[in-house]
Amino acid sequence: EHDEDPRRRQRAGQQEIAKVARILQDIGGDIPAEIDWIIRVDGHTDNIPIVGNTDFADNWELSQARALSVVRYMINVLGIEPERLSANGFGEYQPVNPANTPQARAQNRRIELKFTER
């Protein structure tokens, strides 16, 4: 269900985030100054409840923490202005695949970057 090597998965995710963030920054440079835009970072989880000894009370907290981690990466590593970012957590409540299978759950554990007006 999960990639065996979390470091490899994290590196791949960071590369994808960096690629998309650069595209969004380029687009931002072409937008008129009077339009107040942000990159919205949305965290999502699968539908498996969090139980046991964990840092997160539930999937809401986990999705928010994932989004915040990406926002911090975009600020600290990619140099994106914090005023241009928003971190949001949606828990398990906006699945892209409603099936109750390992593949669907993997698809639902995701980060989405959305370019939008503030």
Question: Whereabouts are the PLM-identified features?
Answer:
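Periplasmic OmpA-like peptidoglycan-binding domain that tethers envelope proteins to the cell wall
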Residues: 3-7, 11-23, 28, 37-40, ...
